[in-house]
Regions:
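Helix-turn-helix
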Residues: 11, 15-57
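Short, basic, alpha-helical segments at the C-terminal edge of helix-turn-helix-like DNA-binding modules
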Residues: 60-66
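Hydrophobic/aromatic-rich alpha-helical bundle segments in the mid-to-C-terminal region
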Residues: 113-163
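N-terminal intrinsically disordered/low-complexity leader segments
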Residues: 1-7, 161-163
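Solvent-exposed, amphipathic alpha-helical segments
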Residues: 11, 15-23, 68-73, 101-109, ...
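Helix-loop "lid/cap" segments that line or gate small-molecule binding pockets
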Residues: 88-93, 100-114
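Hydrophobic alpha-helical connector segments
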Residues: 57, 68-99, 125
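Amphipathic alpha-helical interaction segments
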Residues: 11, 53, 81, 85, ...
């Protein structure tokens, strides 16, 4: 009976995501992914056929995971507790490299963000979260980034509460 390739494929994808988290798009090579996955480069190509395909799969994984984690955090509590949870998730993503990978992939056009905007309020929420992610990933002092985060959410609440 042939061996199930699913775990190997998943391991390679996880290694690709980790490679992007550590080095961004600049550090993404098939050799680096293979080393991190503990396989030979040929096996990476066997499962994904090209660097581009693997990169697109990793970009989709990062975008989906990032979005789900931020939505979970925002929905974890009402009011400011949900915003605080979202802030902590943004900090976590800045620390684990997810923000760096997401910024790098978005800048390269590998993550399509146009479909997610359902209206002004949704677009404004995404802009707040994404802007703060960029600030954290680029080294803006934590207190300054948090002040901006709080001010932007308060402004959005004020604007959307007006008749």
């Amino acid at each position: 009976m042939p061996k199930d390739a699913t775990p190997t494929r998943a391991n390679i994808l996880a290694a690709a995501v980790q490679t992007l988290q550590r080095g961004g798009l600049e550090g993404f090579t098939l050799d680096a992914v293979a080393r991190r996955a503990g396989v030979v480069k040929g096996l990476v190509l066997y499962h994904y056929a090209s660097r581009g395909r693997l990169l697109r799969a990793a970009a989709a994984q990062i975008a989906t995971s990032r979005s789900a984690a931020l939505q979970r955090a925002l929905g974890s509590a009402s009011g400011t507790a949900g915003l605080d949870a979202c802030w902590e998730e943004l900090r976590h993503q800045a620390e684990d490299g997810t923000a760096r990978a997401w910024i790098s992939l978005s800048s390269a056009g590998l993550i399509d963000r146009s479909a997610g905007n359902g209206g002004f309020e949704d677009a404004a929420r995404e802009a707040i979260v994404d802007g703060c992610a960029v600030a954290l990933a680029t080294g803006v002092p934590l207190a300054d980034a948090r002040d901006a985060y709080d001010a932007l959410w308060l402004t959005l609440l004020e604007v959307t509460a007006q008749p």
